[in-house]
Amino acid sequence: MENQINIAGAGPAGLTAAIVLAKHGYKPTVYEMSPDVGHRMNGDFQGLENWSADKDIVALLRELGIDINFLCIPYYEGDIYAPKMAPLKIKSERPVFYLVKRGGADDSFDAGLKKQAVSLGVEIVFSRRIESFEEKTIIAEGPKRADFIAAGITFDTETKDCAVVIFNDEIAPKGYVYLLINKGFGTMASVIYKDFKNTKKYFKNLLNFFQNEKYIDIRNEKRFGGFGNFFIRNTNAFDKKIYIGESAGFQDYLWGFGLRYAVLSGYLAAMSIIRDLDYDFLWKKEIKPMLETSLVNRYLIEKFGDFGYRYLAKKFAEGDPCNFLNRNYKPSFLKSLILPIAKSRNKIYGNV
């Protein structure tokens, strides 16, 4: 059938593609090898970042055809820690990020997208992979290898709502720690880019840090882990296969925020089918510049170490962190000069 499209993977990217296709008269079938959506997630909080583009992420979701039928809380402020300096307060005029829940809970991002897809007549086949690729297929199966990993806990708490970020290589080498609390539930995690074999040590250091620096009431803790994959290749359209989300390497290499790229790439893949457009042209225009800028940002933050962490913390605190980040996520002449060096240090081009 001409209007029959198969989608491999029921994550945010795959479900977004399914929703957009269904709204335009197509009949997408989503195949998910897990028994339900969000199975790889753990009920943890994540952030829909709101700084890498001018358009507010919630406005973008609505523009793409996604309803906000899930927990989505704007956070405008928080605390930031960096080595050898006192913690600083940051505050923004626009939301720095929107807190969302991942996993299968009724108010999760994943479950919300599932409800929207099903309401439009999308068929989701769980616990099954696609067996044939004779029809046009969108591949949204998530990351394949770990370029960074996350180790953390979810927990119940009486601590008031907050957002905390820590830059410290003793806790999260070349990465960061985040603490998010909303209405009695919290997520605390260390995102690590180096020395994966010592993850347990860094997680222990994380718990010790919060015991010493910022008391957090933690009850009913549940541990979780995850990983992210980043690469940039020349094409993400192979014969009848279109790759989106982390299957295409679409991930912010600086800090691992991939949800914006997931939904945007799902939308672009759907529109390439609906309007018979070149998918590679679309993602290279809308996504690739941000990917390359994030690669340069990753190179710079690793190069400058503790000095870089303190510089970022001070910049976030002395002005509007969203505006500062937005400027630094945009391509520039200087970053175009640094890009070849960043490429040579990170062998992430051309991976399949």
Question: Which residues make up each language-model segment?
Answer:
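Glycine-rich FAD pyrophosphate-binding loop
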Residues: 8-10, 22-44
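Active-site-proximal substrate-binding core of FAD-dependent oxidoreductases
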Residues: 232-233, 255, 271-311
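A conserved FAD-binding loop/helix module that cradles the flavin
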Residues: 251-273
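C-terminal auxiliary extensions adjacent to catalytic cores
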Residues: 304-352
